[in-house]
Amino acid sequence: MNTGVICGVRVSHNRASVEEIELAGERDSRTIMETLLTRDGITESFAIQTCNRSEAYVVADGAVAGRRALASFAPDVRDGAVVDMSHEESLRHLLRVATGLESLVLGEDQILGQFKRAIEVARGIGALGPMLEAGVTKAIHVGERARSETSINEGAVSIGSAAVRLAGQSVGLNGRKALVIGAGEMGSLVAESLASTNISEVVIANRTIENAESIAETINSPAYAVSLDSLTEVITEASIIMTATGYGKYLIEPTDIDGAGETFIIDLAQPRNVHPATADIENAIVQDIDALESITKETEASRQAAAREVDAMIDEEFDRLLESYKRQRADEAISEMYEAAEHVKRREVETALEKLEKQGTLTDNQRETISSMADTLINQLLAAPTKSLRDAAAEDDWTTIQTAMTLFDPNFGGDTPQPDRPDDIPRAAERGDISGDDLPDDVPNHIAEKVSDG
Protein backbone atom coordinates (compact mmCIF):
# COMPACT_ATOMS: atom_id res chain seq x y z
CA MET A 1 0.00 0.00 0.00
CA ASN A 2 1.46 3.36 -1.00
CA THR A 3 -0.36 5.47 1.57
CA GLY A 4 0.52 6.06 5.21
CA VAL A 5 0.23 8.58 8.01
CA ILE A 6 1.65 12.11 7.78
CA CYS A 7 3.38 13.51 10.86
CA GLY A 8 4.89 16.98 11.16
CA VAL A 9 6.90 19.18 13.49
CA ARG A 10 7.53 22.92 13.39
CA VAL A 11 9.60 25.58 15.11
CA SER A 12 8.33 29.00 14.05
CA HIS A 13 8.08 32.65 15.05
CA ASN A 14 4.71 32.06 16.74
CA ARG A 15 6.33 30.25 19.66
CA ALA A 16 10.06 30.26 19.13
CA SER A 17 12.76 32.91 19.37
CA VAL A 18 15.18 33.68 16.57
CA GLU A 19 17.84 31.67 18.41
CA GLU A 20 15.55 28.64 18.64
CA ILE A 21 14.58 28.81 14.97
CA GLU A 22 18.26 29.06 14.13
CA LEU A 23 19.01 26.02 16.29
CA ALA A 24 16.28 23.99 14.59
CA GLY A 25 17.61 24.99 11.18
CA GLU A 26 21.27 24.13 11.71
CA ARG A 27 21.02 21.49 8.97
CA ASP A 28 19.77 22.46 5.51
CA SER A 29 16.43 21.13 4.29
CA ARG A 30 18.03 18.62 1.92
CA THR A 31 20.05 17.05 4.73
CA ILE A 32 16.98 16.96 6.97
CA MET A 33 14.92 15.16 4.33
CA GLU A 34 17.66 12.69 3.47
CA THR A 35 18.22 11.89 7.15
CA LEU A 36 14.52 11.37 7.82
CA LEU A 37 14.26 8.94 4.91
CA THR A 38 16.79 6.67 6.61
CA ARG A 39 14.55 6.25 9.68
CA ASP A 40 12.62 3.02 10.17
CA GLY A 41 9.12 3.10 8.75
CA ILE A 42 9.56 6.41 6.86
CA THR A 43 8.68 6.44 3.16
CA GLU A 44 8.49 10.18 2.37
CA SER A 45 9.83 13.43 3.80
CA PHE A 46 9.58 17.18 3.27
CA ALA A 47 11.24 20.14 4.97
CA ILE A 48 10.96 23.90 4.59
CA GLN A 49 13.17 26.54 6.18
CA THR A 50 12.82 30.31 6.10
CA CYS A 51 14.03 33.14 8.28
CA ASN A 52 11.11 32.61 10.66
CA ARG A 53 10.37 28.89 10.50
CA SER A 54 11.91 25.45 10.29
CA GLU A 55 9.53 22.57 9.63
CA ALA A 56 9.69 18.89 8.70
CA TYR A 57 7.12 16.31 7.63
CA VAL A 58 7.23 12.55 7.09
CA VAL A 59 4.98 9.80 5.85
CA ALA A 60 5.24 6.79 8.13
CA ASP A 61 3.72 3.35 8.51
CA GLY A 62 2.03 4.70 11.64
CA ALA A 63 1.92 7.77 13.87
CA VAL A 64 4.33 6.22 16.39
CA ALA A 65 7.00 5.66 13.74
CA GLY A 66 6.48 9.19 12.43
CA ARG A 67 6.86 10.84 15.83
CA ARG A 68 9.90 8.71 16.60
CA ALA A 69 11.62 9.82 13.39
CA LEU A 70 10.82 13.50 13.97
CA ALA A 71 12.09 13.40 17.55
CA SER A 72 15.58 14.03 16.15
CA PHE A 73 14.50 17.15 14.22
CA ALA A 74 15.13 19.78 16.92
CA PRO A 75 16.37 17.89 19.98
CA ASP A 76 18.07 20.91 21.56
CA VAL A 77 15.12 23.29 21.26
CA ARG A 78 12.94 23.69 24.35
CA ASP A 79 9.67 21.75 24.29
CA GLY A 80 7.46 24.84 24.31
CA ALA A 81 8.93 26.05 21.02
CA VAL A 82 8.47 22.74 19.19
CA VAL A 83 4.99 21.90 17.90
CA ASP A 84 4.15 18.33 16.89
CA MET A 85 1.42 17.94 14.27
CA SER A 86 -0.86 15.01 13.55
CA HIS A 87 -1.87 13.85 10.06
CA GLU A 88 -4.68 16.37 9.57
CA GLU A 89 -2.90 19.14 11.49
CA SER A 90 0.12 18.75 9.20
CA LEU A 91 -1.94 18.98 6.04
CA ARG A 92 -3.92 22.01 7.20
CA HIS A 93 -0.73 23.74 8.35
CA LEU A 94 0.92 23.25 4.95
CA LEU A 95 -2.03 25.05 3.35
CA ARG A 96 -1.84 27.87 5.89
CA VAL A 97 1.89 28.32 5.33
CA ALA A 98 1.54 28.55 1.54
CA THR A 99 -1.28 31.11 1.77
CA GLY A 100 0.75 33.36 4.06
CA LEU A 101 -1.58 33.02 7.05
CA GLU A 102 1.29 31.65 9.15
CA SER A 103 3.79 34.28 8.00
CA LEU A 104 5.22 37.01 10.19
CA VAL A 105 3.87 39.38 7.53
CA LEU A 106 0.28 38.26 6.95
CA GLY A 107 -0.30 37.33 3.31
CA GLU A 108 3.24 38.09 2.11
CA ASP A 109 4.17 36.64 -1.28
CA GLN A 110 7.73 35.56 -0.55
CA ILE A 111 6.71 32.36 1.24
CA LEU A 112 5.13 30.94 -1.92
CA GLY A 113 8.45 31.09 -3.77
CA GLN A 114 10.26 29.60 -0.79
CA PHE A 115 7.68 26.81 -0.65
CA LYS A 116 8.13 26.03 -4.35
CA ARG A 117 11.91 25.87 -4.00
CA ALA A 118 11.59 23.49 -1.04
CA ILE A 119 9.39 21.25 -3.20
CA GLU A 120 11.97 21.30 -5.99
CA VAL A 121 14.67 20.16 -3.56
CA ALA A 122 12.42 17.40 -2.20
CA ARG A 123 11.57 16.16 -5.69
CA GLY A 124 15.20 16.31 -6.71
CA ILE A 125 16.23 13.81 -4.04
CA GLY A 126 13.15 11.62 -4.40
CA ALA A 127 11.78 12.51 -0.96
CA LEU A 128 8.19 13.03 -2.08
CA GLY A 129 5.78 10.18 -2.68
CA PRO A 130 2.03 10.08 -3.34
CA MET A 131 1.03 11.39 0.09
CA LEU A 132 3.26 14.46 0.48
CA GLU A 133 3.28 15.20 -3.24
CA ALA A 134 -0.49 15.59 -3.09
CA GLY A 135 -0.23 17.68 0.08
CA VAL A 136 2.39 20.17 -1.10
CA THR A 137 0.85 20.44 -4.57
CA LYS A 138 -2.48 21.29 -2.97
CA ALA A 139 -0.72 23.85 -0.75
CA ILE A 140 0.74 25.64 -3.79
CA HIS A 141 -2.67 25.58 -5.49
CA VAL A 142 -4.36 27.12 -2.45
CA GLY A 143 -1.57 29.67 -2.04
CA GLU A 144 -2.03 30.85 -5.62
CA ARG A 145 -5.83 30.89 -5.27
CA ALA A 146 -5.59 33.00 -2.11
CA ARG A 147 -3.55 35.65 -3.88
CA SER A 148 -5.62 35.73 -7.07
CA GLU A 149 -9.10 35.50 -5.52
CA THR A 150 -8.69 37.56 -2.34
CA SER A 151 -6.86 40.72 -1.27
CA ILE A 152 -4.73 38.90 1.32
CA ASN A 153 -1.51 40.27 -0.16
CA GLU A 154 -2.72 43.76 -1.04
CA GLY A 155 -0.87 46.35 0.99
CA ALA A 156 1.23 43.65 2.60
CA VAL A 157 4.80 44.57 3.37
CA SER A 158 7.52 42.03 2.76
CA ILE A 159 9.98 41.21 5.50
CA GLY A 160 12.52 43.19 3.51
CA SER A 161 10.37 46.31 3.27
CA ALA A 162 9.40 45.95 6.95
CA ALA A 163 13.10 45.98 7.84
CA VAL A 164 13.63 49.18 5.84
CA ARG A 165 10.61 50.79 7.50
CA LEU A 166 11.96 49.85 10.94
CA ALA A 167 15.31 51.44 10.09
CA GLY A 168 13.54 54.59 8.97
CA GLN A 169 11.55 54.81 12.19
CA SER A 170 14.59 54.08 14.36
CA VAL A 171 17.38 56.21 12.90
CA GLY A 172 16.05 57.76 9.68
CA LEU A 173 17.15 57.00 6.13
CA ASN A 174 17.64 60.40 4.51
CA GLY A 175 21.14 60.75 3.07
CA ARG A 176 22.49 57.60 4.69
CA LYS A 177 24.61 54.91 3.05
CA ALA A 178 23.23 51.38 3.33
CA LEU A 179 24.95 48.02 3.06
CA VAL A 180 22.95 44.94 2.07
CA ILE A 181 24.74 41.64 2.64
CA GLY A 182 23.22 38.91 0.48
CA ALA A 183 21.90 38.93 -3.09
CA GLY A 184 19.21 36.29 -2.85
CA GLU A 185 15.47 36.92 -2.83
CA MET A 186 15.52 38.57 0.59
CA GLY A 187 18.55 40.72 -0.20
CA SER A 188 16.96 41.81 -3.45
CA LEU A 189 13.74 42.83 -1.66
CA VAL A 190 15.71 44.82 0.91
CA ALA A 191 17.73 46.60 -1.78
CA GLU A 192 14.60 47.47 -3.76
CA SER A 193 12.91 48.84 -0.65
CA LEU A 194 15.96 50.93 0.24
CA ALA A 195 16.07 52.30 -3.30
CA SER A 196 12.53 53.65 -2.92
CA THR A 197 13.64 55.88 -0.01
CA ASN A 198 15.91 58.92 0.29
CA ILE A 199 18.95 56.75 0.97
CA SER A 200 22.11 58.19 -0.60
CA GLU A 201 23.73 54.96 -1.79
CA VAL A 202 23.27 51.18 -1.57
CA VAL A 203 26.13 48.70 -1.48
CA ILE A 204 25.31 45.04 -2.16
CA ALA A 205 27.83 42.50 -0.90
CA ASN A 206 27.66 38.88 -1.93
CA ARG A 207 29.84 35.81 -2.26
CA THR A 208 29.01 35.66 -5.98
CA ILE A 209 29.59 39.25 -7.02
CA GLU A 210 27.75 38.84 -10.35
CA ASN A 211 24.48 38.37 -8.46
CA ALA A 212 25.15 41.50 -6.43
CA GLU A 213 25.98 43.45 -9.60
CA SER A 214 22.68 42.36 -11.16
CA ILE A 215 20.74 43.89 -8.26
CA ALA A 216 22.86 47.05 -8.23
CA GLU A 217 22.12 47.58 -11.92
CA THR A 218 18.36 47.17 -11.60
CA ILE A 219 17.42 49.13 -8.48
CA ASN A 220 16.45 52.79 -8.79
CA SER A 221 19.23 54.23 -6.64
CA PRO A 222 22.98 54.87 -6.77
CA ALA A 223 24.42 51.43 -6.04
CA TYR A 224 27.45 49.21 -6.51
CA ALA A 225 28.47 45.65 -5.70
CA VAL A 226 31.36 44.16 -3.74
CA SER A 227 32.44 40.64 -2.85
CA LEU A 228 32.42 39.34 0.71
CA ASP A 229 36.21 39.64 0.67
CA SER A 230 35.77 43.43 0.70
CA LEU A 231 33.15 43.39 3.44
CA THR A 232 35.38 44.75 6.22
CA GLU A 233 36.17 47.85 4.19
CA VAL A 234 32.56 48.80 3.42
CA ILE A 235 31.09 47.96 6.85
CA THR A 236 32.65 51.03 8.47
CA GLU A 237 31.34 53.28 5.68
CA ALA A 238 27.68 52.28 6.08
CA SER A 239 25.38 53.60 8.78
CA ILE A 240 22.63 51.09 7.95
CA ILE A 241 23.45 47.40 7.47
CA MET A 242 21.04 44.59 6.64
CA THR A 243 22.13 40.97 6.38
CA ALA A 244 20.18 38.34 4.45
CA THR A 245 22.42 35.44 3.46
CA GLY A 246 22.25 31.70 3.97
CA TYR A 247 25.98 31.65 4.59
CA GLY A 248 25.74 29.83 7.92
CA LYS A 249 28.41 31.84 9.73
CA TYR A 250 28.97 35.24 11.32
CA LEU A 251 29.91 37.85 8.73
CA ILE A 252 29.91 40.78 11.16
CA GLU A 253 31.95 40.54 14.37
CA PRO A 254 32.11 43.13 17.18
CA THR A 255 35.58 44.19 16.01
CA ASP A 256 34.16 45.12 12.59
CA ILE A 257 31.89 47.75 14.16
CA ASP A 258 34.05 48.93 17.05
CA GLY A 259 35.16 52.50 16.39
CA ALA A 260 32.62 53.11 13.63
CA GLY A 261 29.99 55.80 13.97
CA GLU A 262 26.32 55.22 14.65
CA THR A 263 25.37 51.94 12.95
CA PHE A 264 21.91 50.41 12.69
CA ILE A 265 21.99 46.69 11.89
CA ILE A 266 19.10 44.32 11.13
CA ASP A 267 20.00 40.64 10.88
CA LEU A 268 17.44 38.89 8.67
CA ALA A 269 19.64 35.88 8.00
CA GLN A 270 18.95 32.34 9.10
CA PRO A 271 21.35 31.24 10.54
CA ARG A 272 22.32 34.68 11.82
CA ASN A 273 25.11 36.67 10.16
CA VAL A 274 25.75 39.09 13.04
CA HIS A 275 27.60 37.96 16.15
CA PRO A 276 25.36 38.57 19.21
CA ALA A 277 28.14 40.44 21.01
CA THR A 278 28.01 43.12 18.31
CA ALA A 279 25.00 44.57 20.14
CA ASP A 280 27.31 45.45 23.05
CA ILE A 281 29.36 47.86 20.93
CA GLU A 282 28.74 51.54 21.66
CA ASN A 283 26.77 53.35 18.95
CA ALA A 284 25.65 50.02 17.43
CA ILE A 285 21.96 49.12 17.37
CA VAL A 286 21.40 45.47 16.42
CA GLN A 287 17.92 44.12 15.68
CA ASP A 288 16.66 40.80 14.37
CA ILE A 289 13.48 39.57 12.74
CA ASP A 290 11.58 39.61 16.04
CA ALA A 291 11.78 43.41 16.01
CA LEU A 292 9.68 43.57 12.84
CA GLU A 293 6.45 42.52 14.54
CA SER A 294 5.36 46.06 15.35
CA ILE A 295 5.83 47.07 11.71
CA THR A 296 3.87 44.13 10.33
CA LYS A 297 0.97 44.71 12.72
CA GLU A 298 0.41 48.18 11.25
CA THR A 299 -0.80 46.80 7.91
CA GLU A 300 -2.29 43.55 9.17
CA ALA A 301 -5.65 44.94 10.33
CA SER A 302 -6.68 45.92 6.81
CA ARG A 303 -6.23 42.31 5.63
CA GLN A 304 -8.20 40.54 8.36
CA ALA A 305 -11.34 40.26 6.21
CA ALA A 306 -9.27 38.71 3.43
CA ALA A 307 -7.70 36.35 5.97
CA ARG A 308 -11.17 35.08 6.87
CA GLU A 309 -11.86 34.46 3.18
CA VAL A 310 -8.62 32.51 2.90
CA ASP A 311 -9.51 30.49 5.99
CA ALA A 312 -12.78 29.46 4.34
CA MET A 313 -10.88 28.59 1.17
CA ILE A 314 -8.50 26.42 3.18
CA ASP A 315 -11.43 24.59 4.79
CA GLU A 316 -12.84 23.84 1.35
CA GLU A 317 -9.56 22.68 -0.19
CA PHE A 318 -8.60 20.74 2.95
CA ASP A 319 -11.81 18.70 2.72
CA ARG A 320 -11.10 18.00 -0.95
CA LEU A 321 -7.59 16.85 -0.09
CA LEU A 322 -8.84 14.47 2.60
CA GLU A 323 -11.42 13.06 0.19
CA SER A 324 -8.72 12.44 -2.41
CA TYR A 325 -6.66 10.51 0.17
CA LYS A 326 -9.71 8.44 1.08
CA ARG A 327 -10.37 7.61 -2.57
CA GLN A 328 -6.72 6.72 -3.04
CA ARG A 329 -6.73 4.29 -0.11
CA ALA A 330 -9.98 2.70 -1.21
CA ASP A 331 -8.76 2.43 -4.81
CA GLU A 332 -5.56 0.71 -3.68
CA ALA A 333 -7.50 -1.82 -1.61
CA ILE A 334 -9.93 -2.41 -4.48
CA SER A 335 -7.05 -2.82 -6.91
CA GLU A 336 -5.42 -5.42 -4.66
CA MET A 337 -8.75 -7.23 -4.35
CA TYR A 338 -9.20 -7.43 -8.11
CA GLU A 339 -5.58 -8.48 -8.63
CA ALA A 340 -6.02 -11.30 -6.13
CA ALA A 341 -9.26 -12.35 -7.84
CA GLU A 342 -7.57 -12.21 -11.25
CA HIS A 343 -4.80 -14.47 -9.95
CA VAL A 344 -7.33 -17.05 -8.77
CA LYS A 345 -9.35 -16.70 -11.98
CA ARG A 346 -6.36 -17.37 -14.23
CA ARG A 347 -5.41 -20.43 -12.22
CA GLU A 348 -8.91 -21.89 -12.13
CA VAL A 349 -9.68 -21.14 -15.79
CA GLU A 350 -6.42 -22.78 -16.79
CA THR A 351 -7.30 -25.85 -14.70
CA ALA A 352 -10.81 -26.01 -16.19
CA LEU A 353 -9.53 -25.68 -19.75
CA GLU A 354 -6.99 -28.45 -19.20
CA LYS A 355 -9.75 -30.78 -17.97
CA LEU A 356 -12.02 -29.91 -20.88
CA GLU A 357 -9.20 -30.37 -23.41
CA LYS A 358 -8.86 -33.96 -22.23
CA GLN A 359 -12.48 -34.50 -23.25
CA GLY A 360 -12.00 -33.01 -26.70
CA THR A 361 -10.40 -30.07 -28.48
CA LEU A 362 -11.91 -26.67 -27.61
CA THR A 363 -12.52 -23.96 -30.15
CA ASP A 364 -11.33 -20.38 -29.61
CA ASN A 365 -14.94 -19.31 -29.08
CA GLN A 366 -15.41 -21.93 -26.37
CA ARG A 367 -12.24 -20.78 -24.62
CA GLU A 368 -13.40 -17.17 -24.83
CA THR A 369 -16.82 -18.10 -23.42
CA ILE A 370 -15.25 -19.75 -20.37
CA SER A 371 -12.89 -16.83 -19.76
CA SER A 372 -15.71 -14.29 -20.21
CA MET A 373 -17.91 -16.19 -17.78
CA ALA A 374 -15.11 -16.10 -15.19
CA ASP A 375 -14.70 -12.34 -15.67
CA THR A 376 -18.44 -11.82 -15.23
CA LEU A 377 -18.46 -13.87 -12.04
CA ILE A 378 -15.58 -11.83 -10.60
CA ASN A 379 -17.19 -8.51 -11.44
CA GLN A 380 -20.52 -9.54 -9.97
CA LEU A 381 -19.01 -11.08 -6.84
CA LEU A 382 -16.74 -8.09 -6.17
CA ALA A 383 -19.30 -5.37 -6.90
CA ALA A 384 -20.63 -5.38 -3.33
CA PRO A 385 -17.17 -5.50 -1.65
CA THR A 386 -16.04 -2.67 -3.93
CA LYS A 387 -18.92 -0.49 -2.76
CA SER A 388 -18.23 -1.47 0.85
CA LEU A 389 -14.59 -0.42 0.58
CA ARG A 390 -15.51 2.94 -0.93
CA ASP A 391 -18.07 3.48 1.83
CA ALA A 392 -15.49 2.47 4.44
CA ALA A 393 -13.02 5.04 3.14
CA ALA A 394 -15.68 7.75 3.11
CA GLU A 395 -16.52 6.94 6.74
CA ASP A 396 -12.86 6.74 7.86
CA ASP A 397 -13.28 3.02 8.58
CA TRP A 398 -9.62 2.16 8.11
CA THR A 399 -9.97 -1.17 9.94
CA THR A 400 -11.98 -2.48 7.00
CA ILE A 401 -9.45 -1.09 4.53
CA GLN A 402 -6.55 -2.64 6.48
CA THR A 403 -8.36 -5.99 6.61
CA ALA A 404 -8.91 -5.93 2.86
CA MET A 405 -5.26 -5.13 2.24
CA THR A 406 -4.15 -7.92 4.56
CA LEU A 407 -6.37 -10.45 2.82
CA PHE A 408 -5.62 -9.47 -0.76
CA ASP A 409 -2.08 -8.00 -0.78
CA PRO A 410 0.58 -10.67 -0.11
CA ASN A 411 3.15 -8.01 0.78
CA PHE A 412 1.00 -5.80 2.98
CA GLY A 413 2.05 -5.64 6.63
CA GLY A 414 5.21 -7.68 6.22
CA ASP A 415 6.77 -10.58 4.35
CA THR A 416 4.42 -13.29 5.64
CA PRO A 417 3.27 -15.48 2.72
CA GLN A 418 -0.50 -15.20 2.29
CA PRO A 419 -2.75 -18.14 1.30
CA ASP A 420 -4.45 -18.02 -2.10
CA ARG A 421 -7.88 -18.60 -0.58
CA PRO A 422 -9.45 -18.84 2.92
CA ASP A 423 -9.58 -22.65 2.89
CA ASP A 424 -5.78 -22.67 2.54
CA ILE A 425 -5.28 -20.75 5.80
CA PRO A 426 -5.24 -23.84 8.07
CA ARG A 427 -2.73 -25.54 5.77
CA ALA A 428 -0.56 -22.41 5.83
CA ALA A 429 -0.63 -22.55 9.62
CA GLU A 430 0.47 -26.18 9.55
CA ARG A 431 3.47 -25.18 7.41
CA GLY A 432 4.30 -22.45 9.95
CA ASP A 433 3.77 -19.63 7.42
CA ILE A 434 1.22 -17.83 9.60
CA SER A 435 -0.23 -17.93 13.09
CA GLY A 436 -3.43 -16.74 14.69
CA ASP A 437 -1.75 -13.43 15.52
CA ASP A 438 -1.29 -12.74 11.80
CA LEU A 439 -5.02 -12.82 11.04
CA PRO A 440 -7.35 -9.82 10.84
CA ASP A 441 -10.11 -9.68 13.46
CA ASP A 442 -12.95 -10.48 11.09
CA VAL A 443 -11.61 -13.76 9.64
CA PRO A 444 -14.36 -16.40 10.15
CA ASN A 445 -14.18 -18.09 13.55
CA HIS A 446 -13.99 -21.64 12.18
CA ILE A 447 -10.88 -20.72 10.20
CA ALA A 448 -9.27 -18.80 13.04
CA GLU A 449 -9.85 -21.77 15.36
CA LYS A 450 -8.11 -24.12 12.95
CA VAL A 451 -5.12 -21.77 12.77
CA SER A 452 -4.91 -21.49 16.56
CA ASP A 453 -5.23 -25.28 16.97
CA GLY A 454 -2.53 -25.80 14.33
Curated annotation (Swiss-Prot):
Domain of life: Archaea
Alphabetized GO MF terms: glutamyl-tRNA reductase activity; NADP binding
Region Disordered, residue ranges: 407-454
Recorded catalytic activity of this chain's protein: (S)-4-amino-5-oxopentanoate + tRNA(Glu) + NADP(+) = L-glutamyl-tRNA(Glu) + NADPH + H(+)
GO biological process, one term: protoporphyrinogen IX biosynthetic process from glutamate
Group of enzyme by EC: oxidoreductase
Compositional bias ranges of the Basic and acidic residues kind: 418-434, 443-454
Active-site annotation: C51 (nucleophile)
HAMAP family, alphabetized: Glu_tRNA_reductase (MF_00087)
Protein name, as recorded: Glutamyl-tRNA reductase
Disulfide bonds: none
NCBIfam families xrefs: hemA
Domain remarks: Possesses an unusual extended V-shaped dimeric structure with each monomer consisting of three distinct domains arranged along a curved 'spinal' alpha-helix. The N-terminal catalytic domain specifically recognizes the glutamate moiety of the substrate. The second domain is the NADPH-binding domain, and the third C-terminal domain is responsible for dimerization.
Function recorded in the entry: Catalyzes the NADPH-dependent reduction of glutamyl-tRNA(Glu) to glutamate 1-semialdehyde (GSA).
Family: Belongs to the glutamyl-tRNA reductase family.
Stretches assigned to coiled coil: none
